[in-house]
């Protein structure tokens, strides 16, 4: 049976002219299978099905290179004091007792189902997921990622996957100071599992799943682990993501242990290269460090929302871009709303730069599309052009919360939301229509997530000093009025 040829229409289409995004009025996109055949107006050929989305913006799907694959704990840490005091960071006594898994294997996979659904719902079509290792016994494993790969194929999300591996873990001493626990053998074993996963799953599900090397963060790596990672990356030509330059603790630890900066240490192993993507790049030792990033071709993944919540910011998006550094985007935290990250990223950049000239909204939009594609070495993603993969999103326009209409991107940047995405096609497959991710029961997914989040909160008590009652670890935004309110279940029992 032949593959149907599908045509999409809308009042606006973001095309690509070979150099830049361009806007088509009353535009059309035609694709067959997973490949785009036409972008413009007045397609002359035959089409099996036309879908007219009316007053909407058809554009390329967003690329999220630090995509939340977790039940995000930010809602617990927000305005809750030191993370070591609430059991998010491992306590020394928890480490000595022996860490354990917060979730079962089935629950781990459910986390990804919930998170991947959120990504698709918000217009993200390519994701490189991230989860927290604080809730794990030690990193991630091959078998669970075989399940994540199958889930990607089921939901239709394009993913870059691999089990996270690490040789160290940060923990808290009783006085609140941070220290490192090392397990070199576990780190190297994890890398072997990651290499095996890459060889077995790179290109799986008709190319929807690609492999990647995803060590946890630079301060949890040892020289031996980075040296071997570099060798594997070179052998496999694999994308590598490594969190670095993101905290003062990391910068100081790397300087103390390795007698160099984070970026210099990576560069010494050849890990600053065009196949390397680096969240977050907040801290560096000077302009020469930025030039090092530009010269090596490594990409920086900008995650503005998660850092702004903690009072920190990239300084600045425009300055990094002016240096010639390729910038991609990541959501990193909940919600998986790329529009919110673009909007806040623009505002933060302008505050940092002191004007409205160095960074434009199109620069952020490019980072979430073309920049992400460049970071992955994919000139067939992040754009709607003949020959590109049919990763297409549709955002409604004219919604009441968007205000009076002037320009599709400007209205979405100023007042749009992730759930303004009403349809998504990934590799030509319809994965969401009318805001509904196909095959997903949102209410059931939310019910199960709420139950699992309860388990996550209780696990904090195991990791905290003295194993206190879990509810004593978290503060509500407003003090409870009485003891009944403080002790009542967080969620009411469902009514039928």
Task: Walk through the language-model features, giving the residues of each.
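His/Asp/Glu-enriched, well-ordered alpha-helical/loop segment
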Residues: 12, 268-275, 316-399, 414-417
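N-terminal metal-binding scaffold of metallo-dependent hydrolase/deaminase domains
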Residues: 1-45, 54-58
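Alpha-helical scaffold segments that flank or form the walls of functional sites
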Residues: 77-158, 190-206, 450-458
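Active-site gating loops and adjacent loop-to-helix segments of metal-dependent hydrolytic enzymes
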Residues: 76-108, 137, 168-187, 248-275, ...
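Metal-coordinating catalytic core of metallo-dependent amide/deamination hydrolases
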Residues: 138-279, 288-289
């Amino acid at each position: 049976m032949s593959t149907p040829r599908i045509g999409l229409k809308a009042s606006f289409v973001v095309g690509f002219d070979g150099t830049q995004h361009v806007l088509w009025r009353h535009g059309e996109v035609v694709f067959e299978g997973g490949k785009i055949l036409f972008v413009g107006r007045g397609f002359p050929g035959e089409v099996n099905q036309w879908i007219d989305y009316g007053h909407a913006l058809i554009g390329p799907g967003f690329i999220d290179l630090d995509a939340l694959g977790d039940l995000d704990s930010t809602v617990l840490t927000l305005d809750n004091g030191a993370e070591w005091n609430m059991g998010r960071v491992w306590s020394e006594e928890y480490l000595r007792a022996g860490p354990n898994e917060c979730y079962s294997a089935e629950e781990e996979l459910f986390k990804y189902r919930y998170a991947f659904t959120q990504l698709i719902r918000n217009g993200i079509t390519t994701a490189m997921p991230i989860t927290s290792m604080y809730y794990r016994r030690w990193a991630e494993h091959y078998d669970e990622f075989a399940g994540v790969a199958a889930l990607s194929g089921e939901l239709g999300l394009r993913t870059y996957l691999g089990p996270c591996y690490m040789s160290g873990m940060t923990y808290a001493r009783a006085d609140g100071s941070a220290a490192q626990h090392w397990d070199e053998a576990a780190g190297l074993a994890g890398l072997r599992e990651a290499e095996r996963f890459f060889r077995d799953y790179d290109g799986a599900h008709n190319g929807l799943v690609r492999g990647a090397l995803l060590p946890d963060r630079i301060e949890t790596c040892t020289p031996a682990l980075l040296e071997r990672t570099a060798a594997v990356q070179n052998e496999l030509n694999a994308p590598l993501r490594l969190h670095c330059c993101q905290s003062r603790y990391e910068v100081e630890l790397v300087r103390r242990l390795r007698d160099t900066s984070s970026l210099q240490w990576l560069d010494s192993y050849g890990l600053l290269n065009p196949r390397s993507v680096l969240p977050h790049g907040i801290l560096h030792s000077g302009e020469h460090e930025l030039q090092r990033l530009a010269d090596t071709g490594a990409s920086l993944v900008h995650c503005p929302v998660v850092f702004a919540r903690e009072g920190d910011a990239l300084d600045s998006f425009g300055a990094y871009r002016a240096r010639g550094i390729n910038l991609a985007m990541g959501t990193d935290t909940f919600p998986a709303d790329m529009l919110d990250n673009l909007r806040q990223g623009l505002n933060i950049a302008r505050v940092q730069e002191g004007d409205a000239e160095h960074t434009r909204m199109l620069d952020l939009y490019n980072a979430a599309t073309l920049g992400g594609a460049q970071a992955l070495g994919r000139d067939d993603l992040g754009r709607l052009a003949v020959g590109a993969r049919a990763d297409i999103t549709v955002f409604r326009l004219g919604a009441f919360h968007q205000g009076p209409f002037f320009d599709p991107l400007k209205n979405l940047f100023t007042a749009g939301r992730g759930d303004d995405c009403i349809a998504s096609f990934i590799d030509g497959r319809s994965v969401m229509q009318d805001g509904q991710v196909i095959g997903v029961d949102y209410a059931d997914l939310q019910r199960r997530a709420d139950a699992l989040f309860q388990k996550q909160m209780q696990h904090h008590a195991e990791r905290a000093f003295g194993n206190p009652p879990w509810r004593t670890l978290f503060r509500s935004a407003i003090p409870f009025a009485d003891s009944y309110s403080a002790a009542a279940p967080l969620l009411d029992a469902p009514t039928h």
